[in-house]
Amino acid sequence: MQRPIVYVGMSADLIHPGHINILSRAAELGDITIGLLTDAAIASYKRLPHMTYEQRKAVVENLKGVASVVPQRTLDYAENLRTVRPDFVVHGDDWQTGVQRHTRERVIEVLSEWGGKLVEIPYTPGISSTRLHSSVKEVGTTPNVRLSRLRRLLDSKDIVRILEVHNGLTGLIIENSKVTVDNQAREFDGMWSSSLTDSLARGKPDTEAVDVSSRLQMVNELFEVTTKPLVFDGDTGGKPEHFGFTVRSLERLGVSAVIVEDKEGLKRNSLFGTDVPQTQSSVEDFSERIRIGKRAQITDDFMVIARIESLILEKGMADAVHRAEAYVDAGADGIMIHSRQSDPAEIFEFCRYFDKLPRRVPLVVVPTSYSSVRESELADAGVNMVIYANHLMRAVYPQVTKVVQSILQHGRAHEAESMLASIKDALSIIPENAG
């Protein structure tokens, strides 16, 4: 006699006694089919899992009582349930409230089509995946794990969200900041090491005046207190014969990607556009720079992303699209298209042309000038990564200036207190301060 089919949906990133309890109870009902959530399914409502889908599958299919494992590509069980048509779905009772309650209602609705039943197991007290993930985060990460995370994010999310960082404190803020929007957790996926804000933090001009070694020291300090992936602003990449060494150094630290722009000569900030002299590299010279970077890297995970300045320098859309195709052919792992217009119209136009190219790589934008555009609009246009490139430094400057002026004006600090964090809050930024 054939045993009943029991469907259990799982992320299975960190297996704990609560999972084993559910599987043991499910095995009493019949043969277990695991609907293993893909990386994309998990990333749609919380952080990317530590282990890849294939790694998690290798663990789950060897658990006692598991008869088969199938990928579950969305948080919604409906498609898999209609394919498998299980007699039972088994789940912990912790999904009766919160972000998954609508998923639960949908499961009950679909099961009713053939008389299947939902069996809910009481939550195992004292342990949860969330707590375990927090503990893992406290331990930290390794260079290889951090480095590979960006490619996994690009493969798993509609759009990857990156924010500028210029010291360990801003790194901690990005690491720990999270909001809930429409019952889903939202956080930044990674960090951007900006040459502009690195320079400003040192009181120097944004002309590549801060050498790569000095910037790498900041990256090293940042990596001591964070776990998220980092994208490095490589400016022009320096001399072509030096770029390969830069790539090796970044990769060794665990940086996930370098973005290098197709300009040459004295570096000036792109947002000046044609108001200052700026020279764009030839397609041939910059393509060779990309090839130098790709030849230098050791792993397959590190990304060399080509930044196109054609729209900034008013060279036209055709030139930008031509360069994109040439840079992809040269081996670029991604394309960043830059614009200083106040609306995203030319970015959207570029996206339409870019999607028609023979080879497609991730597309990156930096909406500094056209800040009114929403991430959802960019994702719909085909953008894969959005970088908020200078916002934490720009947030610091006006507030610090106000505090300085207030103390000077009043001859005391009392009037500035409303603009300051309390001593208690300032100390709590670093938990170890509490002893």
UniProtKB/Swiss-Prot annotation:
Cytidine 5'-{[hydroxy(2-hydroxyethyl)phosphonoyl]phosphate} binds at S11, A12, Y45, K46, Y77, H91, G92, D93, D94, Q100, T124, P125, G126, I127. Its cofactor is a divalent metal cation. Pathway: Antibiotic biosynthesis; fosfomycin biosynthesis. GO terms for biological process: antibiotic biosynthetic process. Disruption phenotype: Deletion mutant does not produce fosfomycin. Residues 1-139 are annotated as: Cytidylyltransferase. InterPro entries: Archaeal_FAD_synthase, Cyt_trans-like, ICL/PEPM, PEnolPyrv_PMutase_core, Pyrv/PenolPyrv_kinase-like_dom, Pyrv_kinase-like_dom_sf, Rossmann-like_a/b/a_fold. The CyTase reaction requires a divalent metal ion. Highest activity is observed with Co(2+), but it can also use Mg2(+), Ni2(+), Fe2(+) or Mn2(+). Bifunctional enzyme that catalyzes two steps during fosfomycin biosynthesis. It catalyzes the conversion of phosphoenolpyruvate (PEP) to phosphonopyruvate (PnPy), the first step of the pathway. It also catalyzes the cytidylylation of the 2-hydroxyethylphosphonate (HEP) intermediate to produce cytidylyl-2-hydroxyethylphosphonate (HEP-CMP), the fourth step of the pathway. Contains an N-terminal cytidylyltransferase (CyTase) domain and a C-terminal phosphoenolpyruvate phosphomutase domain. In the N-terminal section; belongs to the cytidylyltransferase family. In the C-terminal section; belongs to the isocitrate lyase/PEP mutase superfamily. PEP mutase family. This is Fosfomycin biosynthesis bifunctional protein Fom1. The gene is fom1.
